[in-house]
């Protein structure tokens, strides 16, 4: 409706962006989303080295990473949908973080105890993406809820911050940690 339209005046837009990008709750939720996704994205950026060098997988074997990861994303998303309306968003996020934390601890323990090998080196990635996908929808809503009249603008800011963090991961952090499966973990 015309009454709910936002003006495109530069001063109004600058204030609106400032309001969103200086909100501590928004920035905290965006950081959570970025770091959660970053725990998986680091493997995406390191996939050729992780799979081919560390695990000895051929060029045609990238399913070993992306198959379990996608299954984790889909099943976690399904569970998050089942949680909706039954438990609070914060409870859903807490469960997602518990799963991601367990996956991370398991990943580090496996890399300390065993040499890199399939399927053990990718199993924690399935569990991590499962937990990430459980938490992500509720965390996204928490980041957008403070701005009911400007959800699109807030979503745009959220994706801008996420993309910037992904760029940092891809260009700086991934090359620093892909030297071993333990540093990736």
Give the predicted meaning of each segment:
Residues 2-30:
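Juxtamembrane intracellular "pre-TM" segments in multi-pass secondary transporters
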Residues 59-67, 156:
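Small-residue hotspots at the loop-to-helix junctions and early N-terminal turns
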Residues 75-91:
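Helix-to-loop junctions at the C-terminal end of transmembrane segments
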Residues 91-139:
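C-terminal transmembrane helical hairpin of 12-TM major facilitator-type secondary transporters
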């Amino acid at each position: 409706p015309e009454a709910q339209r936002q003006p495109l005046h530069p001063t109004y837009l600058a204030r609106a962006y400032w309001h969103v990008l200086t909100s501590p709750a928004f920035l905290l939720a965006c950081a959570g989303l970025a770091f959660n996704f970053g725990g998986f994205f680091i493997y995406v950026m390191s996939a050729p080295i992780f799979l081919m060098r560390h695990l000895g997988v051929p060029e045609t074997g990238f399913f070993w990473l992306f198959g379990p990861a996608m299954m984790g994303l889909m099943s976690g998303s399904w569970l998050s949908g089942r949680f909706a309306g039954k438990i609070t968003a914060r409870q859903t996020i807490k469960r997602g973080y518990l799963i991601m934390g367990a996956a991370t601890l398991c990943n580090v323990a496996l890399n300390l105890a065993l040499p890199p090998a399939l399927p053990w080196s990718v199993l924690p990635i399935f569990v991590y993406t499962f937990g990430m996908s459980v938490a992500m929808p509720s965390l996204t809503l928490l980041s957008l809820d403070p701005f009911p009249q400007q959800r699109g603008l807030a979503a745009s800011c959220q994706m801008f911050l996420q993309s910037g963090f992904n760029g940092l991961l891809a260009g700086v952090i991934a090359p620093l940690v892909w030297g071993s499966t333990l540093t990736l973990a």
